[in-house]
Amino acid sequence: MSSNFDGIKKRKFGIEIEMTGLTRSQAAKAMANVLDGRVEHEGGSYDKYVVTDAKNRKWAVVYDGSINCYNSNGDRASKSYSVEMNSPVLEYEDIPLLQEVVRALRRAGGVTGPRYCAGTHIHISADDYTPQQIRNLVNIFASKEDFLWDALQVSTARESYCRKMDKEFIKEINQKKPTDMETIKRLWYHGRMSEQFQHYSNSRYVICNLHSFFQHGHYEIRAYNGSLHAGEVRSQIVLALAISNAAMTKKYCSPHVSQSDNMRYSFRVWLLNLGLIGDEFKNCRAHLLKHLEGDIAWRHPEDGIVARAKLKEKRELEKQAARERRAEPVSGNSTQAENVPEENNEPLESECEGVEEELEMSM
C-alpha cells in the first residue's frame, strides 16, 4: 500500500450498531461469549449493560428510542428489545474481533436495517485534524454525498436522523477558509453557540456530524444502514477510514458535486483513488458497489460492447490460425470464443489510471 494510504490503517474508530430481535441482556451475553468477558448491568436511563473484554476495554449495550422493536418471532415487542451496541475505541487490527461480535449478535437473533429504523454510526478520531483537514472532510462528503446516498442505500425511513450536508455551511466554510476551529464551530452552529453544549443538537443529524467532534474530538458518519453482516460492517469501517485519510493527506478537496451517467464505474474509480486497491479490499469494493447500476469496467458502456466484440473476433481468428497451422479441421462450434471478459468482471486497477480528471473524481 502506498505511503499516502498508510493512514487508513492507523486511525482509531468506534462503531454503534442499532438492532432489535433480541433483548439488551441477550445481546450483552452473546458479546461476552466472543470477547471472553464479563457482563455488568449498570442500568440508568439507557439501561446500560457493559461487557469488559480481555484488554479491559468496555463494550456497551444501551437503549435507543428510535428503534422499532420486534422479538425473535417478528412480533412487536417491548423496549427491552431496543438494542444499540457501542464499541470501545478500536484500531484497524481489531476489525476481525468486531466481526466476530457482529456474527455473535446475529446468531443470537439480532436483526437490523431500515425496516427497524436501525442504523450504524461510525466515529473517527480527529483530535489531530487541522482546520484545513476539517474543510477537506466536509467537502468530500458534500461532493460525493449523491454517490454515497445511492451506494449506501440511505433509507428514507432514516432521513430525520441522516440528512445531506448543510449547503449554507459548505458555502461559508469555503468562502471564509477558516484557519481556526472556533470559526468552524461558529459556522457549523450558525452562530447559535449554546447548541455545542446540547447532546441532541439538531446539527448532529447529517451524513458527517461535526457536533460530536466539537464535543469529544471525533466526528460521526451517520449514513450507514444497520448491518449485522460482518463483511458489510468491515466495508463501512474501511470506507470511513479511507475518507478520513484522504481528508488528512490531500492538499485541497473540492466541494464540487460529482455527477456521472455510469455511477458504478465512477464510484469504483473513486474507491481506488481513496486507496481501496487490490485483493485486500476486493470484498469491500464489492459490498460498496453492489447497489449501483452501470458497467463497472467501462466509463461508456457502449465502448465495452465494441471492445468485447473486437476481443472475441481477435481470439477466434487466433484459434482459426492455430487450427490451420496444425492442419486440423475446423469444428462446427468455431464461432464461439473462450475467456471473453463478461460485462460484470472487475477490471484491473491499472485500467482506471488517469481517468479521475475526466470524471472530475479527484478530491
Question: Which residue stretches match the model-derived regions?
Answer:
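Short, conserved phosphate-binding/catalytic loop or strand-edge motifs used
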Residues: 116-124
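C-terminal accessory/tail domains of diverse enzymes
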Residues: 1-114, 127-363
